[in-house]
Amino acid sequence: MARYTASACRICRRENLKMYLKGDRCYTDKCAIERRPYPPGQHGQGRVKFSGYGVQLREKQKVKRMYGLLENQFRGYYHRASAAKGKTGDNLLQQLELRLDNVVFRMGFADTRNEARQLVRHGHFQVNGRKVNIPSFAVKPGTAVEVVEKSRKVLRISEALETVDRRGIPQWISLDKKAFKGTVTTVPNREDLTMPISEQLIVELYSK
C-alpha cells in the first residue's frame, strides 16, 4: 500500500504550519519549524507566491497530510460529504475527525495520528466492546473506544496518556484515563477544530 515517506518535519515546513506530526518533539525547541521556519530544499527560504488554484491545492495537500490520507481516500470523503445534507466543508471535516485513528489520537491514547493508526491496526482497541483494527472505521456519537485489557501496559499508550493534559481533549470527547476508555459524546463542531484549515478552498478545488 502506498504511503508517505517524507520526513514529518519536512511536511510541516513545506506547509508552513506546525501539524504536531512528531508528538512530544513538537512541543519543544527541537521542533524543526521553530528552528527553520521556511520550506525544505536549496531554495526554501524564498517562498513561492501561489495562484488561486495553487492556494486551493496547497490547502488540500495540507489537510491530507494532517490526517495521513492518500488522494483516493480523501476524494472519497469529499464525495460523501458533498452528497450529505449541510455544508460540504463541515461534513468533510466531521468525517475526518470521526475516523477511529483520529479519535484514538484525540482521546490521548497516541502522540500522533500516525502512531494511532499503527496502534489500531495492531488490534489494541475495541469499539463498544468489539475489537476493531480498521483505522478508517467511522465512529458515531455515543460510541465508547477502549484499550483492550492486555494492551494497557503498552508503553506508547501509557506514555501518551501521561501527557494528554498538555495536548488537551476536545469537547466532543470524554475520557476516563484510569479505565483507558473514552467516549464520543457528540458530533464535532467546526469550532472544535483549532488547526487553521480553510475547508472552503478544498470544496472550491473539487467543485471545478
Curated annotation (Swiss-Prot):
UniProt record, GO biological process: ribosomal small subunit biogenesis; translation
CDD domains, alphabetized: S4
Keywords from the named record: Ribonucleoprotein, Ribosomal protein, RNA-binding, rRNA-binding
Domain (S4 RNA-binding) ranges: 98-161
Cellular component GO terms, alphabetical: small ribosomal subunit
HAMAP family: Ribosomal_uS4_B
Subunit structure: Part of the 30S ribosomal subunit. Contacts protein S5. The interaction surface between S4 and S5 is involved in control of translational fidelity.
Family: Belongs to the universal ribosomal protein uS4 family.
Physiological role: One of the primary rRNA binding proteins, it binds directly to 16S rRNA where it nucleates assembly of the body of the 30S subunit.
Protein name per its UniProtKB record: Small ribosomal subunit protein uS4A
Organism: Myxococcus xanthus (strain DK1622)
Encoding gene, per UniProt annotation: rpsD1
